């Protein structure tokens, strides 16, 4: 008999000899992120509600749940500022993690390695198309503010250092050439007439 699923567990039922034998194995449960939905074909969609317009803002479709969660976090900080509920802390932010033991007063404070750094290591040159969203440009869910362009460029050069020297291209504008332009023949595109005869 085929396996069935019940409450996140896989149950295999086999009938043999005198009765039924049931084997239960726990399946690995996926982590669910705020603002992220898994598509049936395996990719992850990210969206957020705009608090001002009370509408959904589409942030994009991503290969991993962590990338989609990062897009949601960036949009949440853009919309709600420091009060935003996010999936991951900002780099350098410490998080409170409960050890899960009997003593709930014990709290272990650690700095969490963010998924953004792991994504940068795996895909340092990943490029995404830009989309115009609300107040700025969104590149795969990350908003672009022209006033912060210099600091973003400095951070990008630190994270993804350029391995080649830039090349200056100079255009020679001072040279003038005479171009002979002949007038084009007028096209007669009246469909009621026979096609024009072209002289070769």
From Swiss-Prot:
SUPFAM superfamilies associated with the record: DNA-binding domain
Top-level taxonomic group: Eukaryota
GO cellular component: nucleus
Compartment annotation: Nucleus
DNA-binding region, residue range(s): 32-89
SMART domains xrefs: AP2
GO molecular function: DNA-binding transcription factor activity; transcription cis-regulatory region binding
Classification via InterPro entries: AP2/ERF_dom, AP2/ERF_dom_sf, DNA-bd_dom_sf
Disordered, as annotated region: 1-22, 84-104
GO BP annotation list: defense response; ethylene-activated signaling pathway; glucosinolate metabolic process
Keywords assigned: DNA-binding, Ethylene signaling pathway, Nucleus, Plant defense, Repressor, Transcription, Transcription regulation
Motif EAR-like (transcriptional repression) in this chain: 189-195
Function of the protein: Involved in the regulation of gene expression by stress factors and by components of stress signal transduction pathways. Transcription factor that binds to the GCC-box pathogenesis-related promoter element. Acts as a transcriptional inhibitor and may regulate other AtERFs.
Similarity comment: family membership: Belongs to the AP2/ERF transcription factor family. ERF subfamily.
Written domain comment of the UniProt record: Contains a slightly degenerated ERF-associated amphiphilic repression (EAR) motif, which may be involved in the activity of transcriptional repression.
PANTHER family: AP2 DOMAIN CLASS TRANSCRIPTION FACTOR, ETHYLENE-RESPONSIVE TRANSCRIPTION FACTOR 10-RELATED
Protein name: Ethylene-responsive transcription factor 9
Protein's organism: Arabidopsis thaliana
Gene (name only): ERF9
């Amino acid at each position: 008999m085929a396996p069935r699923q019940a409450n996140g567990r896989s149950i295999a039922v086999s009938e043999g000899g005198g009765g039924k034998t049931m084997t239960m194995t726990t399946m690995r449960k996926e982590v669910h992120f705020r603002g992220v939905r898994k598509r049936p074909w395996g990719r992850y969609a990210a969206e957020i509600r705009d608090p001002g317009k009370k509408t959904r803002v589409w942030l994009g479709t991503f290969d991993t749940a962590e990338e989609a969660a990062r897009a949601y976090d960036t949009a949440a900080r853009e919309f709600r500022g420091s009060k935003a509920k996010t999936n991951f802390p900002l780099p350098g932010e410490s998080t409170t993690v409960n050890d899960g033991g009997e003593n709930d007063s014990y709290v272990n404070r650690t700095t969490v390695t963010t998924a953004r750094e792991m994504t940068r290591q795996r895909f340092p040159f990943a490029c995404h198309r830009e989309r115009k969203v609300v107040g700025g440009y969104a590149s795969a869910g990350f908003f672009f503010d022209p006033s912060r362009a210099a600091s973003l460029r400095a951070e990008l050069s630190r994270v993804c250092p350029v391995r080649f020297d830039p090349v200056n291209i100079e255009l020679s504008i001072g040279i003038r050439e005479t171009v002979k332009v002949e007038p084009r023949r007028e096209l007669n595109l009246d469909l009621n007439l026979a096609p024009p005869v072209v002289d070769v």
